Curated annotation (Swiss-Prot):
This is Multifunctional CCA protein. It comes from Salmonella schwarzengrund (strain CVM19633). Its EC number is 2.7.7.72, 3.1.3.-, 3.1.4.-. Belongs to the tRNA nucleotidyltransferase/poly(A) polymerase family. Bacterial CCA-adding enzyme type 1 subfamily. PANTHER family: MULTIFUNCTIONAL CCA PROTEIN (PTHR47545:SF1).
Length: 413
């Protein structure tokens, strides 16, 4: 029995990055030998065991053979005669097909170290094409390591295009697509994930609402980058700089979906694209089974982001109505989330990346003022039932009006 550290832990250690999870491969052992050594079996489809002390995963070396469609159509063979090299060959990328033995020696049969140094994401073997999930995984790795200047090898991108054209991605379940997307959205450069999917044709298959934005022009006066798809990825990049929150990043990604519905004869203007986009956000979220809290914020951002940009000319009554509409009284975090997505929208434009966004500050300040109005004082003043809400609204509007006159006067007045 020989044990090797494999995959991501070896890769990240060689890159000088923190190692989070450790995976191990056991060569030359049977399931019974693992059980006799105190390991606990957890794998249903193939033999995976938990270490009795560390609880890290130890998998018996195995090979895989394509036996059906999609990413689940594989037959696994795990036995003592499976070599380490055979186990590593079934992995997706050369940089993930690395192992380290007890002496610290690196086993690298597929030149993963060379590709690490060259900053290349390259598939191990033609078997890559048998698993459509790998298209999304490569896109996610490209996003994860973009700050280290990794790029996808030409032959790997070509294979990803072939897989997409062959309809392989249609076998992916919504849950798997969303899981990879969720992980990609939490990387330092989530926009790279969607750019890679577009480069290989997968964006049109998996995210048609986003793909439809490319080639749709916006007024050059406001959008020097012109292309709405380009703007969308720029705003996502900016959102990633402004916030680590998945909610903020996903909502930013979806903020302009409505522009994809604008008839060509009305280009480059997109009046009413906010409310129009709400239906597309709902459609995308239902298809991919996106969690409700992310969906709800994304719909609000799609509908109201343009309103936030006009904050100086908004009436106090409109501002309080906005807080009602986003349910800020029960979910106060939404004020900050919407301020951040609106800022990402404005700064995600060519030449505006370093712009100030005072509207975000004003939104936060107005919220603090409105929130400070005391419900207790309204009740103690003798108001009852529906009168309480009406009086609260009246006092909130008055408080915001007083604040706005001093801090954010209407430029037209």
């Amino acid at each position: 029995m020989k044990i090797y550290l494999v995959g991501g832990a070896v890769r990240d250690a060689l890159l000088g990055l923190p190692v989070k999870d450790k995976d191990w491969v056991v060569v030359g052992a049977t399931p019974q030998e693992m059980l006799d050594a105190g390991y606990q079996q957890v794998g249903r489809d193939f033999p995976v065991f938990l270490h009795p002390q560390t609880h890290e995963e130890y998998a018996l070396a195995r090979t895989e053979r394509k036996s059906g469609s999609g990413y689940t159509g594989f037959t696994c063979y795990a036995a003592p005669d499976v070599t380490l090299e055979a186990d590593l060959q079934r992995r997706d990328l050369t940089i993930n097909a690395l192992a380290r033995d007890d002496d610290g020696q690196i086993i690298d049969p597929y030149h993963g170290r060379r590709d690490l140094e060259a900053r290349l994401l390259r598939h191990v073997s033609p078997a890559f094409g048998e698993d459509p999930l790998r298209v999304l995984r490569v896109a996610r790795f490209a996003a994860r390591y973009a700050h280290l200047s990794f790029r996808i090898a030409d032959e790997t991108l070509s294979l990803m295009r072939d897989m997409t054209a062959a309809g392989e991605l249609e076998h992916l379940t919504p849950e798997r697509v969303w899981k990879e997307t969720e992980n990609a959205l939490t990387t330092r450069n989530p926009q790279v994930y969607f750019q890679v999917l577009r480069d290989c044709g997968a964006l049109r298959v998996l995210f048609p609402e986003i793909d439809a934005l490319f080639g749709v022009p916006a007024p050059a006066k406001w959008h020097p980058e012109i292309d709405t798809g380009v703007h969308t990825l720029m705003t996502l990049s900016m959102a990633a700089m402004l916030s680590p929150q998945l909610d903020v990043r996903f909502a930013t990604l979806c903020h302009d979906l409505g522009k994809g519905l604008t008839p060509k004869n009305l280009w480059p203007r997109h009046h009413g694209h906010g409310p129009a986009g709400v239906k597309l956000v709902e459609q995308l979220c239902q298809r991919l089974r996106v969690p409700n809290d992310l969906r709800d914020l994304a719909k609000l951002v799609a509908e109201y982001h343009d309103l936030i940009h006009t904050f100086p000319i908004l009436q106090p009554k409109t501002i309080v109505k906005l807080f009602d509409a986003i349910d800020a009284w029960r979910k106060p975090q939404r004020v900050e989330q919407i301020a951040l997505t609106s800022e990402a929208d404005v700064r995600g434009r060519t030449g505006f990346e370093a712009s100030d966004y005072p509207q975000g500050r004003w939104l936060r300040e107005a919220w603090q003022v409105a929130q400070a109005v005391s419900t207790k004082e309204v009740v103690e003043a003798g108001f009852k039932g529906i009168e309480i809400r009406e009086e609260l609204t009246k006092r909130r509007i008055a408080a915001v009006a007083n604040w706005k006159e001093k801090r954010c006067p209407n430029p037209a007045s």
